[in-house]
Structure formats: structure tokens, C-alpha cells
């Protein structure tokens, strides 16, 4: 049976400042940790990315033409405050006013994120969110933006608190490149959730007219053998690291006994302890019912198997299928079932995981209000032929995920929109320019845009709300 989506549904496209803007040192922008980290460790930089800093009128015109009525944008903190605090860079402020005005002119609603992986270098090198002083700097930055940009109706505090801690302190593929430090992972999650909660409370206390929420990446975790209690336990512990810890903070205002039991077990196995303060929980509790929406970023699921051994993680950054490895001491290891397809980057394609994750939020956190799928899409090495890309695989991937999203709505979940990652091709943090996701192909040499087959498909979807 053909499935549909609601008439008032947002059909969006997602971007991020550092992945799209380029212009990394233009008009007074301050450095971020990624600038030097990419130069030192990878074969690419964020210059020029998609040159969104100059090309945004083109991208927004394409968005309007192809039925995209919402766009995820992030503000580069170091464009506003080059060192993270102190003196305001007026040219940066002016850029975002012009960008938001163009969005409204094109009838593309901007959903604006304050922090998308790009803490200013001066604060990042000073401990990033492990340093509680930087919580205060983030709140000051948020307060400035809320007041300065009343034209923004939808605010997101953070993009993917989970993968920030994971990338910085577990896998080590994000600056500062620390590996296997689970205590830092949880402390980063916690301090960022406190920052989120305080920003949300500030926004509501000031009486601003818009909506505010947070975007979490929520990869669903399954036991490899659901009949094996040890595999079930491995999936539960992995879920705590990536999902439950931050969801509890968002909607319970504390960590459940089961969550803390898992955290304490993981830290007992791996070392370290957490600094959790009474005032932190007061902040979390004060904001738990104030989130207007939850953004869910979903790309993949994982299957977990019990494992007795040392931690080892190998990140597949070059699309060499089968080269990744993930096992954590005291938690488990990822072992994908043979029947589940995966991408060249070993990302498992499992649309049912999106349905299960949406329903998990609905059932476990009934104060959630509403959900947007804020990122979902398929990255691969697009073949540019005849000024387009015949990306049937991407269309099929998105279609399958929209179908289970439609099922979730039918089963009572309040899902109000979907943002494909990404609107146009952007650079990928740990994969560079080879891995493309966009509806529009970007020639990174000329910065020309070309609609892919998926762009035409998405336009028809947005016009009809029919998934076919």
C-alpha cells in the first residue's frame, strides 16, 4: 500500500556551518579546532566546502524550486565571537541576518542550531565542554543569538551531543583525538546537556515567541542474539553510551537508576569517575518539560554481541567496506547480521531502526511533545554523468525511511518533518569530499550546483506527500 505524510509536513534539507560555508577565516571569523586538526590529520580541509557563505542565495533558490520548505542551518559560534566570548564580530552577525532574510524570502523555514561540532579554538583548547567555564560562555553566546535574531522561529541548542563525546574521546576521529576515555565521553555528554537545559530555560524565561529543542543522533542498538542475556546486556550498555544517558537528561531531568547502574559498570571496567553536581540536576529538571521538539538524526543501527577483551575501534573513513572494528571493554562488540545491507563506510542500512527509535521516545519519554527527523540520508561516491547523478540508491534509502516514519505517525507518534542530509553536497568531517549526500551535486572546483535524480523525486514527494 502506498504511504503518505501529513499535509503540514516539513520537507527539509540539512546543512551545517563548518561543512558548508567555507570562508573559514573570512570577515573576522575566528579559528576552530577543526582547522588545524584537518591540516595535521586528514587529506582535506573545510576550505572551500560548498562555499555556502557566498552561494547561499543559489542554494535557497534551488531549495524553493525543488519543494524544500525547511532548512537546517547552524551558526558558526566563532563568526559571532571569534574567541568564543567577548567582542562581537559584526560582519558575522550581518551575514546571518542576510542568510535568514533570504530563507524567508524563499519560503524556506530556517531551523537554526547554535553548536554543530565547531567550538571556537580558544575554548576547545581549554577543555571544550569538559571545562565548566565554557558552559558559561555557551550560555552567553546563546543569549546573544536569541536576542539578536528574532527572525528565527526554531532554535536547536546542539547538534549530536552523543557523537561529539564519542568522536572526541572514544573513537578519537574529532579533535582533540583522544581514544577510549569513557569517563570523558559521559562527562562531555553531561556538561553539554546541562548547557542545553540552561539555554532552554533562558529562552523560555525571556518569553521569546519561537520554539527550541535539541538534536540527538539516536542509532538503535539490538542484541545480536536476543535469546542470549549477555548480548541483550551488551546492547543495553551500548544504548546507554549513545542514547539513554542523553535522553534521560533531556526528558527526565536526571539519570534513571538503570542508566546509572550501566554507567557505573562501564566506568568500573574502564576507569574514571564523573563530576555530577546538585546544581546540574536542578538545571536539567527545570528544562525537562520545556523542550518544544526533539530532533532525531538517524542513519543506522548496530547489533551488539557480548565480548571479553580490550577496547579497539577502527574508523572506516575512506569507504573501504569491512575495514571498521568496534569493541569496548565491559560493553560488547558490534557484529552485523549477514542479512542487513551496509554502505561502503560500514554504515548499516536498517529503516526499522528509525521506527523503533521514534516509538521508544514516544513510549519512554511521553513528555516529548513532537519530533523532527533532522538528519537522514545516504552517503556514497556519486557518479556524475550528463550533468546529474542517477542516485536511485539514495532515493530507495530515503523512501524506506519515510515509509517507517509514516508508520510511526499512524501508530501515534507526533512527527512533524523530515530533513534530508544534505541539501547540497557538503564536506564530511571524517570522510572528506568523496562521500556525498546532497540532493544537489556540487562541483567543488567550480562550485556549480546540479540537481540529482533524487532532487526531482524529492520535489514530487513534497508536492504530493505521497511516498512512491
From Swiss-Prot:
GO BP field: lactose catabolic process via tagatose-6-phosphate
Residues annotated for D-galactose 6-phosphate binding in this entry: 19, 116, 159-160, 297, 428-429, 435, 437
Keyword Lyase: no
Tree of life domain: Bacteria
Enzyme Commission code: 3.2.1.85
InterPro entries, per the entry: 6P-beta-galactosidase, Glyco_hydro_1, Glyco_hydro_1_AS, Glyco_hydro_1_N_CS, Glycoside_hydrolase_SF
Pathway membership, UniProt: Carbohydrate metabolism; lactose degradation; D-galactose 6-phosphate and beta-D-glucose from lactose 6-phosphate: step 1/1
Catalytic residues (UniProt): 160 (proton donor), 375 (nucleophile)
GO cellular component terms, A-Z: cytosol
Pfam family, one: Glyco_hydro_1
Single annotated GO MF: beta-glucosidase activity
UniProtKB keywords: Glycosidase, Hydrolase, Plasmid
Catalytic activity: a 6-phospho-beta-D-galactoside + H2O = D-galactose 6-phosphate + an alcohol
Stimuli inducing this protein: By lactose. The operon consists of lacABCDFEGX.
SUPFAM superfamilies with a match to the protein in the record: (Trans)glycosidases
Family that this chain belongs to: Belongs to the glycosyl hydrolase 1 family.
Misc remark: This gene was sequenced from pMG820, a laboratory-derived deletion of the naturally occurring plasmid pLP712.
Name of the protein in question: 6-phospho-beta-galactosidase
Organism the protein comes from: Lactococcus lactis subsp. lactis (Streptococcus lactis)
The gene coding this protein: lacG
Amino acid at each position: 500500500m502506498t504511504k503518505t505524510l501529513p499535509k503540514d509536513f516539513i520537507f527539509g534539507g540539512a546543512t551545517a556551518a563548518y561543512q558548508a560555508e567555507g570562508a573559514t577565516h573570512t570577515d573576522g571569523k575566528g579559528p576552530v579546532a577543526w582547522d588545524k586538526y584537518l591540516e595535521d590529520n586528514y587529506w582535506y580541509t573545510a576550505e572551500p566546502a560548498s562555499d555556502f557563505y557566498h552561494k547561499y542565495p543559489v542554494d535557497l533558490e534551488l531549495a524553493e524550486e525543488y519543494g524544500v520548505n525547511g532548512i537546517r542551518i547552524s551558526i558558526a559560534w566563532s563568526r559571532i565571537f571569534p574567541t568564543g566570548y567577548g567582542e562581537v564580530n559584526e560582519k558575522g552577525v550581518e551575514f546571518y541576518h542576510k542568510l535568514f532574510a533570504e530563507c524567508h524570502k524563499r519560503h524556506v523555514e530556517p531551523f537554526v542550531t547554535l553548536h554543530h561540532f565547531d567550538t571556537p579554538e580558544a575554548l576547545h583548547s581549554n577543555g571544550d565542554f569538559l571545562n565548566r567555564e565554557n558552559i558559561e560562555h555557551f550560555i552567553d553566546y546563546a543569549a546573544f543569538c536569541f536576542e539578536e535574531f528574532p527572525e528565527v522561529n526554531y532554535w536547536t541548542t546542539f547538534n549530536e551531543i552523543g557523537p561529539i563525546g564519542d568522536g572526541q574521546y572514544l573513537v578519537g576521529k574529532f579533535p582533540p583525538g583522544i581514544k577510549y576515555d569513557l569517563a570523558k565521553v559521559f562527562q562531555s555528554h553531561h556538561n553539554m546537556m546541562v548547557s542545553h537545559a540552561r539555554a532552554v530555560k533562558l529562552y523560555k524565561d525571556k518569553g521569546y515567541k519561537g520554539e527550541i529543542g535539541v538534536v540527538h543522533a539516536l542509532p538503535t542498538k539490538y542484541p545480536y542474539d536476543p535469546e542470549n542475556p549477555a548480548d541483550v546486556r551488551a546492547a543495553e550498555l551500548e544504548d546507554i553510551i549513545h542514547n539513554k544517558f542523553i535522553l534521560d537528561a533531556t526528558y527526565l531531568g536526571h539519570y534513571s537508576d538503570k542508566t546509572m547502574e550501566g554507567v557505573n559498570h562501564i566506568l568500573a571496567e574502564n576507569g574514571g569517575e564523573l563530576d555530577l553536581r546538585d546544581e546540574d540536576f536542578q538545571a536539567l529538571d527545570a528544562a525537562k518539560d520545556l523542550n518544544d521538539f526533539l530532533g532525531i538524526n538517524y542513519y543506522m543501527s548496530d547489533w551488539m554481541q557480548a565480548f571479553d577483551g580490550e577496547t579497539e575501534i577502527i574508523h572506516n573513513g575512506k569507504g573501504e567496506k569491512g575495514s571498521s572494528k568496534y569493541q569496548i571493554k565491559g560493553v560488547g562488540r558490534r557484529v552485523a547480521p549477514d542479512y542487513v545491507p551496509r554502505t561502503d563506510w560500514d554504515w548499516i542500512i536498517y529503516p526499522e531502526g528509525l521506527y523503533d527509535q521514534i516509538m521508544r521516545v514516544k513510549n519512554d519519554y511521553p513528555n516529548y511533545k513532537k519530533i523532527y527527523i533532522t538528519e537522514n540520508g545516504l552517503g556514497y561516491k556519486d557518479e556524475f554523468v550528463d550533468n546529474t547523478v542517477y542516485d536511485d540508491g539514495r532515493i530507495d534509502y530515503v523512501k524506506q525511511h519515510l515509509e517507517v516514519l509514516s508508520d510511526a505517525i499512524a501508530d501515534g507518534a507526533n512527527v512533524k518533518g523530515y530533513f534530508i542530509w544534505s541539501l547540497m553536497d557538503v564536506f564530511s568531517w571524517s570522510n572528506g569530499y568523496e562521500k556525498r549526500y546532497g540532493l544537489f551535486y556540487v562541483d567543488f572546483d567550480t562550485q556549480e550546483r546540479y540537481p540529482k535524480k533524487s532532487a526531482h523525486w524529492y520535489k514530487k514527494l513534497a508536492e504530493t506527500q505521497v511516498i512512491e
